[in-house]
Amino acid sequence: MARITPITQYRNIGISAHIDAGKTTTTERILFYTGVNHKLGEVHDGAATMDWMVQEQERGITITSAATTTFWSGMAKQFLSHRINIIDTPGHVDFTIEVERSMRVLDGVVMIYCAVGGVQPQSETVWRQANKYKIPRIAFINKMDRTGADFLKVVNQISTRLHVISVPIQLSIGSEENFQGIVDLVKMKAIRWSEHDQGITFKYYDIPKDLLQLANKWHMNLVEVAAEADDELMEKYLQYDDLEEKDIKIGLRKRALNNEIILITCGSAFKNKGVQALLDAIIEYLPSPKDSYKTKNFINQKDSIKNYRYADDKQPFSALAFKIASDSFVGNLTFFRVYSGIVRSGDVVLNSVKDHTERFGRIVQMHANKREEIREVRAGDIAAAIGLKNVTTGDTLCDVNHPIVLEKMDFPEPVISIAVEPKTKIDQEKMGLSLNRLAKEDPSFRVRIDHESNQTIISGMGELHLEIIIDRMRREFKVDANIGKPQVAYRETILNKIENVSGKYIKQSGGRGQYGHVVIDIFPLKPNKSGYLFVNDIKGGVIPGEYISSIDKGIQEQLKSGPLAGYPVVDIGVRLHDGSYHDVDSSELAFKLAASHAFKSAFKLANPILLEPIMHVEVETPEEYMGDVIGDINRRRGIIEGMVDDMIGGKSIKAFVPLSEMFGYATDLRSKTQGRASYSMEFLKYTEAPRSIYDSIVSTQ
């Protein structure tokens, strides 16, 4: 089957924003104008297409990144039909993993900002994630119809808070209840959309006289920005003191794709104004898979040399699995992005990360939670597969004869844990199954058994994250459970190097005995980076090679539950350099236990400490409560990083606060500010816990 849409007419984009910036409403308007939906869905009445989970409809927030495909030929039908694959991502910081894995497979992002609230905390988090993957982006300043809307103030805030050159390609005509349309600064025309057909039709007008001077100023600004794209455009600009429309677009596109600028549009999705022009901007200024840097420079699995793959159907097949989702009818759905080549249902491919083959069963095109079965997918496509058995998020799928490993994703470590106890024997059986399925979907969610208390402990990125998991367990899997209080996920490590610690396991009781003897050094590694390092320095065969992996395994088992208080051990290196063995009695088990004893003894001598998670907290508060808020942060062992004015005359306070001090903060903040302040927090790093915390935790173990 030949390709229907040329790859240059593809746009793989994400829609991302702070919570409540109007992101899902904007996506719903995109689906309406592109003909996917024939009626408008609203978030406030729970009818949004992309928010299909019950939890999303109840809370009015987006939890999972829903995917859909649509087509657009321009407001004035001026383009060939372009295929737009859209991923709508969450705005709540507890679901950062959903944003992260979407960013990994996208070519461009639309960042949505509220015309009243401006750049809010989660906007900065998402911006950093887009920077990490070098994704070109354009901004849509939404809610221009709301009281307090100020387009140019938000433009300025984007420049100052996100450290980027912001280039408006539109101006708003009026604001608040007088918002009527936009000025297109490239064409130098005003655009107004019809209120009789929900904005499907539009007309160009002359720019209103009261806006003409401002429009000329910003038009010249974008001409200068476009001219700086290359020498040829700069020559034209210097010769004519202006550029033609097509040259402006070439220059702006070039600089946007190089991440030198962010182009800014505006509108009101709710009032059906501006989303249509945003769609045109997506086609004109965001990259196709051919333009995207991610299509080349991956690592060949076998020889670790750089290998190139381009977004081309003729190249060997390569794809990245970026999300696993449970489906009540078909089991696991594996969402994947094809970078090169073609794959058809029934094809056998290599999972190059796990080094085993997989057969593609059915391939489906997703629209939120609806599916359409298709026979094949090609370079640039985003689809879901049914029937892949052992694929996890971040795995590379590729041609069996041309192995390649694509750039992996980084997943954050969970920072908060709670105990869950099933209420009945039947619940107990179902709970293990349901939690494992949910953990397979979400790499930032972990499940473990505490062997001392025999409790099931679940860990995640925040209280809301775990609340949603428990809610899904109850609704989707019908599991009833008692929930414990949130616990901080501490870590254990050491400060000093300790050498020549011996560990022995000897058992002689008639017949064949057990004998293992190891001598190790342990040493600290750089914090928050390295995890664990095992160095085998055995010389002269004092311990046979077949026992080395058992020694490593014995140490790694101890890392899962540290000697201090049973928390995971991190940032530690172990050097094995001596020991002895017995010809008859030595075994893998004996060396594993000997290593375990040696590690425990060495750890206790190496000045062990507890590490606690530190959160980056941002509080937005009216100025009159600022003193109370800062005082409260200080009482919670917080360190104030800085303060800036926010868009609505208040203060935005940034601080570093230990997670253990943040439980119940939402309630305390509401009461201190009469409900007028809000906050967000995200994990920053682990640092040494104070002695008082250390003593209270270690003494209870």
From Swiss-Prot:
Function comment: Catalyzes the GTP-dependent ribosomal translocation step during translation elongation. During this step, the ribosome changes from the pre-translocational (PRE) to the post-translocational (POST) state as the newly formed A-site-bound peptidyl-tRNA and P-site-bound deacylated tRNA move to the P and E sites, respectively. Catalyzes the coordinated movement of the two tRNA molecules, the mRNA and conformational changes in the ribosome.
GO molecular function: GTP binding; GTPase activity; guanosine tetraphosphate binding; translation elongation factor activity
Stored InterPro entries: EFG_II, EFG_III, EFG_III/V, EFG_IV, EFG_V, EFG_V-like, EFTu-like_2, G_TR_CS
UniProt KW keywords: Cytoplasm, Elongation factor, GTP-binding, Nucleotide-binding, Protein biosynthesis
One cellular-component annotation, GO: cytoplasm
Entry similarity comment: Belongs to the TRAFAC class translation factor GTPase superfamily. Classic translation factor GTPase family. EF-G/EF-2 subfamily.
Protein name per UniProt: Elongation factor G
Lineage, opening ranks: Bacteria, Pseudomonadati, Pseudomonadota, Gammaproteobacteria, Enterobacterales
Annotated disulfide bonds: none
Localization of this protein: Cytoplasm
Residues annotated to bind GTP: 17-24, 88-92, 142-145
Family annotation (Pfam families): EFG_C, EFG_III, EFG_IV, GTP_EFTU, GTP_EFTU_D2
Gene3D superfamilies reported for this sequence: 3.30.230.10, 3.30.70.240, Elongation Factor G (Translational Gtpase), domain 3, P-loop containing nucleotide triphosphate hydrolases, Translation factors
Any one of the GO BP annotations: ribosome disassembly
Domain tr-type G as annotated: residue spans: 8-290
Primary residence: cytoplasm
NCBIfam families per record: EF-G, PRK12740.1-5, small_GTP
